[in-house]
């Protein structure tokens, strides 16, 4: 773990600022492991600051010193902020160059990730912010690279025991239909049949 990431990790703002002012690279990837060396995790300081226990000041400081909000060598900062539904951090990242439609290392976008997590309210909000619900990707879940928001909506419907009366879910389905998506959504149905 880099000194910079460690300073962020320990919530030491003064040291974070000192290191950046003295040449620390905000885009240096740290590789570390929790329990065994076989389970490594890559992390960038900007990603860490997007988790819920950090104020905006850390993120602002890193971006002021050249942190790249679209660096895919670790989890994208947008994904970390979305995990905690931190709309303020998401908006700030977008204002400072984050690409809302950037694929991560497994070819998912933040809106695909939130659809997978069934966070329908955040999916709608991200769509309003410019996320493309039909951008298709995904390589990590046996989906054949067919993942998009419609795919995960159909998956939710196929599951058979969700809250289909959720107002945000209903809005999302209606909005997808308004752009020409038909349910049942064929790519998700095809994949279900292939896996049976």
Where are each of the predicted segments found?
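A short, hydrophobic/aromatic-rich structural module that often spans a beta strand
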Residues: 68-95, 101, 105, 116-117, ...
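Short coil/turn connectors between adjacent alpha-helices in alpha-solenoid helical repeat scaffolds
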Residues: 50-51, 55, 162-166
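Ankyrin-repeat intra-repeat helix-capping/turn positions
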Residues: 11, 53-54, 85, 118
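Ankyrin-repeat boundary/"N-cap" motif
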Residues: 1-6, 29-49, 71-80, 103-112, ...
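Mid-chain, structured segments of secreted extracytoplasmic proteins
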Residues: 10, 14, 18, 22-24, ...
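Ankyrin-repeat-protein effector appendages
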Residues: 65, 96, 129-134, 138-196
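Ankyrin repeat domain, specifically the short helix-to-loop turn at the C-terminus of the second helix
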Residues: 17-25, 60-68, 91-99, 124-132, ...
């Amino acid at each position: 773990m880099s000194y910079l990431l460690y300073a962020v990790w320990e919530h030491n703002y003064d040291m974070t600022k000192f290191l950046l002012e003295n040449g620390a690279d905000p885009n240096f990837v740290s590789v570390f492991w929790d329990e065994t060396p076989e389970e490594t995790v890559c992390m960038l300081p900007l990603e860490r600051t997007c988790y819920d226990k950090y104020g905006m000041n850390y993120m602002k400081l890193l971006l002021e010193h050249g942190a790249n909000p679209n660096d895919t060598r670790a989890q994208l900062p947008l994904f970390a902020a979305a995990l905690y539904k931190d709309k303020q951090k998401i908006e700030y990242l977008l204002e400072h160059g984050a690409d809302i439609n950037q694929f991560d290392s497994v070819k998912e976008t933040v809106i695909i990730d939130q659809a997978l997590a069934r966070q329908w309210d955040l999916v709608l909000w991200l769509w309003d912010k410019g996320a493309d619900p039909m951008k298709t990707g995904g390589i990590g879940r046996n989906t054949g690279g067919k993942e998009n928001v419609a795919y995960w909506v159909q998956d939710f419907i196929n599951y058979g025991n969700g809250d289909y009366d959720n107002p945000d879910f209903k809005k999302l389905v209606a909005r997808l239909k308004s752009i020409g998506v038909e349910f049942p959504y064929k790519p998700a149905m095809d994949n279900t049949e292939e896996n049976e």
